[in-house]
Regions:
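N-terminal subdomain of lithium-sensitive/metallo-dependent phosphomonoesterases centered on the IMPase/IPPase/PAP
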Residues: 1-86, 226, 248, 255-258
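Oxyanion/phosphate-interacting regions
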Residues: 1-13, 169-177, 190-261
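Residue-level signal for inorganic ion chemistry
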Residues: 19, 44, 55, 89, ...
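A short, compositionally biased
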Residues: 26, 99, 127-131, 221
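Short secondary-structure boundary/capping segments
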Residues: 31-32, 56, 71-74, 116, ...
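Generic detector of well-ordered alpha-helical packing
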Residues: 45, 49, 68, 85-88, ...
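Glycine-rich active-site/cofactor-binding loop and its immediate structural neighborhood
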Residues: 79-121
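Acidic beta-strand-loop-alpha-helix segment within the catalytic core
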Residues: 104-192, 239-261
Length: 261
């Protein structure tokens, strides 16, 4: 584990321990609504504080971009951390274990390091550009399925932007008719990690934020998968529209989506 990932892991583990304690008394967790179907809790904020403080201490010249607290550090910094302190807030608030801490490091705008930590399972996914992806220190690879009708596809509902719902449901209906099934777990970082480890053969979702997908996407890529936008191009980090899959089914997924564009 290199120094960047070591620092990220120590901070994520500390934040994760706080989350586990908070999960034992959810009635005491304070919750605010940022927008329709978009919640933030004091656990999100506490986690972000732990992560930011650790990164500032270790790397005072790095920029840090967070879901809740915005940006810290110089806008011109060569290194930038993109952090989701609690991906899957709604799951957490309902006692579902599918939530995670997501941390990615960019150098001059290029993803270099990624860590996704799932506290309930104590699972640590990580990747370094050009060096592969790991789950709990074990190398992982995407699935090798070819036939779409044998594939399990992950997705996320556009619950915040309801204007996209009709288009999304038409795409989802097409996927469900042509695959072995669909899964909606409610934490994009973990959905992407599921693609990386082969539990899902592909994943797609619209209108995500950089902190939702940056770390998970690099983990998919380093596990042998491909990540694109809905048209098969780069730019998914900026647009938030993402498709991730093993190389053998990506084109088939993009074809289904293109039929509804």
């Amino acid at each position: 584990m290199n120094p960047f990932l070591n620092t990220a892991f120590k901070a994520a583990r500390k934040a994760g321990q706080m989350m586990i304690r908070a999960a034992g008394n959810l009635d005491a967790v304070k919750v605010d609504s940022k927008a329709f179907n978009d919640f933030v809790s004091d656990v999100d904020r506490s986690s972000e504080m732990i992560l930011v403080e650790a990164l500032k201490e270790a790397y005072p010249h790095h920029k840090i971009t967070c879901e809740e607290g915005g940006s810290h550090g110089k806008a011109t910094a060569e290194y930038e951390w993109i952090i989701d302190p609690l991906d899957g807030t709604t799951n957490f608030l309902h006692g579902h274990p599918q939530y995670a801490i997501s941390m990615a490091l960019l150098h001059k705008g290029v993803l270099q390091e990624a860590l996704v930590y799932a506290p309930e399972r104590n699972d640590v996914y990580m990747a370094s550009r050009g060096k592969g992806a790991l789950l709990n220190d074990r190398r992982i690879r995407v699935s090798n399925r070819i036939e779409l009708n044998r594939c399990l596809i992950g997705t996320g509902f556009p619950v915040v932007d309801q204007s996209m719902m009709d288009k999304y449901l038409a795409i989802l209906k097409d996927f469900l008719a042509k695959t072995a099934g669909g899964r909606r777990e409610g934490a994009a970082s973990l959905d992407l990690c599921a693609v990386a480890v082969g539990r899902l053969d592909g994943f797609f979702e619209f209108n995500l934020k950089p902190w939702d997908i940056a770390a998970g996407a690099l983990i998919v890529q380093e596990a042998g998968g491909i990540v694109t936008d809905m048209s098969g191009n780069e730019g998914w980090l900026e647009s938030g529209d993402i498709v991730a899959a093993n190389p053998k089914v990506l084109a088939q997924m993009l074809k289904i989506i293109a039929d509804h564009q």
